[in-house]
Swiss-Prot record:
UniProt GO MF annotations: FMN binding; pyridoxamine phosphate oxidase activity
Subunit structure: Homodimer.
InterPro entries: Pyridox_Oxase, Pyridox_Oxase_CS, Pyridox_Oxase_N, Pyridoxamine_oxidase_dimer_C, Split_barrel_FMN-bd
Cofactor annotation comment: Binds 1 FMN per subunit.
Pathways per UniProt: Cofactor metabolism; pyridoxal 5'-phosphate salvage; pyridoxal 5'-phosphate from pyridoxamine 5'-phosphate: step 1/1; Cofactor metabolism; pyridoxal 5'-phosphate salvage; pyridoxal 5'-phosphate from pyridoxine 5'-phosphate: step 1/1
Catalytic activity: pyridoxamine 5'-phosphate + O2 + H2O = pyridoxal 5'-phosphate + H2O2 + NH4(+); pyridoxine 5'-phosphate + O2 = pyridoxal 5'-phosphate + H2O2
Organism: Caenorhabditis elegans
Function: Catalyzes the oxidation of either pyridoxine 5'-phosphate (PNP) or pyridoxamine 5'-phosphate (PMP) into pyridoxal 5'-phosphate (PLP).
Name the UniProt record assigns to this protein: Putative pyridoxamine 5'-phosphate oxidase
Obligatory cofactor(s): FMN
Disulfide-linked positions: none
Keywords from the named record: Flavoprotein, FMN, Oxidoreductase, Pyridoxine biosynthesis
Enzyme class: oxidoreductase
High-level lineage: Eukaryota, Metazoa, Ecdysozoa, Nematoda, Chromadorea
Length: 226
C-alpha cells in the first residue's frame, strides 16, 4: 500500500484558543478534575452543533487477560462527581475484557477547541434498574437496532441483521414500544477515575498538560512536559 498523495508529514494545524490561550495552574477555575471536566464539556457544547456533532463520543480502551489492548468509540451518557457512564453489550469484546480486567481508559478529543482529556480508572457495572430506565428512554428504533445485534459476534451477512430488525419492528407495531425489552446482555458501566490529564494544544507544539492523580482521598496536581 502506497502513502496517499496528501503530504501527511507537513499537516500542521493552527491552534486557536482565543478565550483561554494557555492552561495555567494559577488560573485554573477549580482544583477538582470533575468540575474542570464539566467546565470544558460545557465550553465545547456551547460552540458545537449538537444535531451533527457528538461531543460525548469518547475512545474507550480496554485490555483483557491476553494483554492485547483494544479501543473503540462509545457515547458517554452521563457524568457525575464519581465518574463517567456508558452503555453497551456485556458479551461484546469490550464487555469480556472488562470482565477480565476492570481497568480502562477514556480519551475525549475536541479539535474545535484544541483540547483533549484523558481519564483512567476502574470500571463497575451500573445497577440493572438504571440500565432498564435508560433503555426505556431510548427511541424505539435505537432499541430495535441494539436488540437486533449480538454485538461482536460473527454474522453471515447484513441481510441476517436486517431480518431480525424487520421482525422486531413488526413486533413493536403490533404490541407497542414496550415489547422491545432490554436484553439481559445489555447494560451500563461506570468508570471511576483515578487519573485525569487535561491537554490544551498550542501552535508551537509547547502544549499544556495538567494532571490530576488520586492519592487516597485527595487529588494531586502536576504539570507534564509536552
Amino acid at each position: 500500500m502506497e502513502t496517499p498523495s496528501i503530504d501527511i508529514q507537513n499537516i500542521r494545524a493552527k491552534y486557536l484558543n482565543s478565550h483561554d490561550p494557555y492552561l495555567l495552574e494559577s488560573k485554573l477555575p477549580t482544583t477538582s478534575p470533575f468540575e474542570l471536566f464539566d467546565i470544558w464539556f460545557r465550553n465545547v457544547a456551547s460552540q458545537s452543533d449538537l444535531t451533527f456533532e457528538e461531543i460525548n463520543a469518547v475512545s474507550l480502551s480496554t485490555v483483557g487477560k491476553d494483554l492485547r489492548p483494544s479501543s473503540r468509540m462509545v457515547l458517554l451518557k452521563a457524568y457525575t462527581p464519581t465518574g463517567f457512564s456508558f452503555y453497551t453489550n456485556y458479551t461484546s469484546r469490550k464487555g469480556n475484557q472488562l470482565e477480565e480486567n476492570p481497568n480502562a481508559a477514556m480519551l475525549f478529543y475536541w479539535p474545535k477547541v484544541n483540547r483533549q482529556i484523558r481519564v483512567e480508572g476502574v470500571v463497575e457495572k451500573l445497577p440493572d434498574e438504571m440500565a432498564v430506565a435508560y433503555w426505556n428512554s431510548r427511541p424505539v428504533a435505537s432499541r430495535i437496532g441494539s436488540k437486533s445485534s449480538d454485538q461482536s459476534k460473527v454474522v453471515p451477512d447484513r441481510e441476517f441483521l436486517e431480518s431480525k430488525k424487520v421482525a422486531l419492528t413488526e413486533l413493536s407495531v403490533r404490541e407497542g414500544a414496550q415489547a422491545i425489552t432490554k436484553p439481559e446482555s445489555w447494560g451500563g458501566y461506570h468508570l471511576i477515575p483515578r487519573y485525569f490529564e487535561f491537554w490544551q494544544g498550542q501552535s508551537d507544539r509547547l502544549h499544556d498538560r495538567i494532571v490530576f492523580e488520586r492519592d487516597v482521598d485527595v487529588w494531586l496536581l502536576k504539570r507534564l512536559s509536552p
